[in-house]
């Protein structure tokens, strides 16, 4: 579904991505893990065409209408309420407006349907952005930190929703710095540090390789051993 090969991105003399290679297979959930400034959002911006690479190749086997995006900014109209925001996208994609409430329910915002986006908390805005991304059931979801502003209980519910979307046929590529979330949700993870992927693989297998199983698998310990950086 996604193929990234030897990707390079520079800003002036600063190389922010260094020879990044990563694949995401059909109906797979893959997370890009790393601290702030590691290059996660840069990769998302390259995938979505917002910026251009300075080297390497990117292939996405989906048309723009088959890709649902949840980015840090954009896509939500602050003067509209939650339901109006989704109804706008429902009309664009030729969907019945009943789909809007269905999706709001799935992200836990049904009770806030008539609340203006400008009045939402950061976490609620994040869930509204996810609702916008999934309203037309895209076959590929690209999500930038989809649970970063959520409390643990709500974050768990959103992870369960993402797993259901995958069961329904979606491929999901996301960025996160939440190791527990990645461990429970993802088929594979790629650990990104200072613009380089230092390791990638199945989460529990990585924990086994680096003796980080302990009582429960600990991806944070794996990252610390590989980079010297604690998340």
Language model features with spans:
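Conserved ABC ATPase signature
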Residues: 116-123
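A short, surface-exposed alpha-helical micro-motif characterized by mixed small hydrophobic
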Residues: 182-184
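Catalytic Walker B motif of ABC-type/P-loop ATPase nucleotide-binding domains
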Residues: 141-144
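ABC ATPase "signature
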Residues: 200-201
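Helix-to-loop junction immediately C-terminal to a conserved catalytic motif
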Residues: 48
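Conserved ABC ATPase "signature" region
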Residues: 87, 91, 96-112
């Amino acid at each position: 579904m996604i193929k990234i090969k030897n990707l390079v991105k520079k800003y002036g003399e600063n190389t922010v991505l260094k020879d990044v290679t990563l694949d995401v297979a059909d109906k797979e959930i893959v997370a890009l893990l790393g601290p702030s400034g590691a290059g996660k959002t840069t990769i998302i911006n390259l995938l979505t065409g917002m910026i251009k690479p300075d080297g390497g190749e990117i292939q996405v086997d989906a048309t723009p209408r088959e890709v649902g995006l949840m980015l840090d900014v954009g896509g939500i109209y602050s003067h509209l309420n939650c339901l109006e925001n989704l109804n706008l996208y429902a009309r664009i994609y030729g969907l019945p407006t009943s789909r809007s409430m269905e999706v709001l329910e799935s992200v836990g915002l049904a009770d806030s349907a008539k609340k203006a986006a400008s009045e939402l908390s950061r976490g609620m805005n994040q869930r509204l952005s996810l609702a916008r991304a999934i309203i037309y059931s895209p076959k590929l979801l690209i999500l930038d930190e989809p649970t970063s502003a959520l409390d643990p209980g709500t974050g768990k519910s959103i992870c369960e929703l993402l797993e259901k979307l995958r069961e329904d046929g979606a491929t999901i590529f996301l960025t996160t710095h939440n190791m527990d979330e990645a461990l429970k949700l993802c088929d594979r993870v790629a650990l990104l540090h200072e613009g380089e992927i230092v390791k990638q693989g199945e989460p529990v297998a990585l924990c086994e390789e680096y003796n980080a199983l302990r009582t429960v698998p600990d991806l944070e310990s794996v990252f610390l051993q590989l980079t010297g950086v604690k998340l």
